From Swiss-Prot:
Transmembrane segments: none annotated. This is ATP synthase gamma chain. Keywords: ATP synthesis, Cell inner membrane, Cell membrane, CF(1), Hydrogen ion transport, Ion transport, Membrane, Transport. It is a peripheral membrane protein. F-type ATPases have 2 components, CF(1) - the catalytic core - and CF(0) - the membrane proton channel. CF(1) has five subunits: alpha(3), beta(3), gamma(1), delta(1), epsilon(1). CF(0) has three main subunits: a, b and c. One of its GO terms (cellular component) is plasma membrane. It comes from Pseudomonas fluorescens (strain ATCC BAA-477 / NRRL B-23932 / Pf-5).
């Protein structure tokens, strides 16, 4: 019965792991719902300011903010939003694949790259992969604040204003639904004209107190809001991916336990049969 004892030990070990993954699944469900609420609360502001900025990009105001002016691309910047923890399936891996693909296109054109990394997984990836990381922040927690991001974002905005980078993009996972998280690379600056149907009209603006003061503040708020929205959406995507990963792990553990239980029963049956055969054989010999 040595084999049977070993199988029983494996079953007990897998059941213990199954309890952990089941608990982690339940925790991820709770955290995902809270993350979805934060995402839904911040999305209207992010979308509205993006719409206003789109109008400004299509308009021709008397003051053209540097964020609205295209220039030759010699160096680009990426704000990469990753998770702090693992056990979330291929969420980070798929994100890094999309980023590396976009970086490869730029490098083929001789464009250099600067990186601002949000999340421990992104920092670990670029330590191994290589890259010019100029700013990094991690451990934002379950309820990230825009104030925690301002310092890192400012590094990239200053680099753009000083001409050290010519384009800034944000790389993150979009929360489509519980089952789908889509890695995206979106250009933040210079602003791209919004292709909405309503923006085909000509827009004129009156600025108070003046265009420069208003746009200087609005453009910074725009970038900060888009990065913050990327962070909260990535957090919701992370919890959804972790929930699915833990559910799959729990289900797989159940299947493995069933298979091992069947093997155990067969081993036990074989041992009993062997014992009976030995008893019968001994009785016959007598």
């Amino acid at each position: 019965m040595a084999g049977a004892k070993e199988i029983r030990s494996k079953i007990a070990s897998i059941k213990s792991t199954q309890k952990i993954t089941s608990a982690m699944e339940k925790v991820a469900v709770s955290k995902m719902r809270k993350a979805q609420m934060r995402m839904a609360a911040s999305r209207p502001y992010a979308e509205r300011i993006r719409q206003v900025i789109g109008h400004l990009a299509n308009a021709n105001p008397e003051y053209r903010h540097p964020f609205m002016i295209d220039r030759a691309i010699k160096r680009v910047g990426y704000v990469v939003v990753s998770s702090d923890r693992g056990l979330c399936g291929g969420l980070n891996t798929n994100l890094f694949k999309a980023l590396v693909k976009d970086m490869a296109v730029n490098r083929e054109q001789g464009v250099e790259i600067d990186l601002c990394v949000v999340g421990s997984k992104g920092a670990a990836f670029f330590r191994n992969f290589g890259g010019n990381v100029v700013a990094a922040i991690s451990h934002l927690g379950e309820e990230p604040s825009i104030n925690d991001l301002i310092g890192s974002v400012k590094v990239m905005l200053d680099a753009y204003l000083e001409g050290r980078i010519d384009r800034l993009s944000v790389v993150s996972n979009k929360f489509i639904n519980t089952m789908t998280q889509q890695p995206t690379v979106e250009q933040l600056i210079p602003l791209e004209a919004t292709p909405d149907q309503e923006l085909k009209h000509h827009w004129d603006y009156l600025y108070e107190p003046d265009a420069k003061e208003l746009l200087d503040g609005l453009m910074v708020r725009y970038v900060e809001s888009q990065v913050y929205q990327a962070v909260v959406e990535n957090n919701a995507a992370e919890q959804a991916a972790r929930m699915i990963a833990m559910k799959n792990a729990t289900d797989n553990a159940g299947d493995l336990i069933s298979d091992l239980q069947l093997i155990y029963n067969k081993a036990r049956q074989a041992a009993i049969t062997q014992e009976i055969s030995e008893i019968v054989g001994g009785a016959a010999a007598v």
